[in-house]
A protein has these predicted regions:
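Short, well-ordered beta-to-alpha junction loops that form the rim of enzyme active sites
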Residues: 18, 117-120
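Short, hydrophobic/glycine-enriched beta-strand segments
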Residues: 12-18, 50
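Short N-terminal binding/cap micro-motifs at the start of the first secondary-structure element
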Residues: 21-27
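Divalent-metal-activated hydrolytic enzyme cores
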Residues: 2-3, 7-9, 26, 56, ...
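Phosphate/ribose-phosphate-bearing ligand recognition and processing surfaces
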Residues: 121-126
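Structural motif
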Residues: 12-13, 112-115
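Short amphipathic alpha-helices and their capping/turn segments at secondary-structure boundaries
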Residues: 1-8, 34-47, 59, 98-112
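Short, surface-exposed acidic-centric catalytic microdomains
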Residues: 31-84
Length: 144
């Protein structure tokens, strides 16, 4: 839940760009978050720093969806059998590079909180970026 009371006046927060409606998700379509939209409407003083770690890491839009498996990220199929690995290409290096760039942006902008995309192999609290930001002392809230 995105509680407006959880943020200080004028606070800078890191936000997954896809939650703001930017078409940077794997399929290239916008997917804005109504919960985030509501928060920003109630708290216009918040300063948003939008990031897409996967794009920052060098992955294109659109791209094959990624799936976390044992600490790594692999490309998967887009069809109904998306859980089966098609190419199996390991794209972990792109995710790690994007996570490092995201952490740098968060630190440079003095962001203490981040609102990230739930279920993303990158942005989920258990994703590569989510874990890296948590280790850096940044509070993560996942939303969809």
């Amino acid at each position: 839940m995105l509680d407006p009371e959880n943020y200080a006046q004028g606070e800078r927060i890191l936000v997954s760009a896809c939650l703001l409606g930017e078409p940077c998700r794997w399929h290239g379509r916008p997917s804005p978050s109504s919960a985030l939209r509501r928060l920003l409407r109630e708290r216009p003083d918040l300063e948003v720093r939008a990031v897409c770690p996967e794009v920052l890491g060098g992955l294109p839009v659109p791209r094959k969806p990624g799936k976390r498996r044992r600490g790594r990220v692999y490309e998967t199929c887009r069809d109904k059998e998306a859980r089966k690995f098609c190419t199996g290409r390991d794209v972990t290096a792109f995710f790690v590079h994007g996570a490092k760039r995201t952490r740098y942006i968060a630190k440079r902008n003095h962001c203490r909180n981040a609102i990230l995309c739930k279920w993303s192999p990158s942005c989920d609290i258990n994703g590569i970026t989510g874990r890296m930001l948590t280790a850096a002392g940044i509070e993560i809230v996942n939303t969809w």
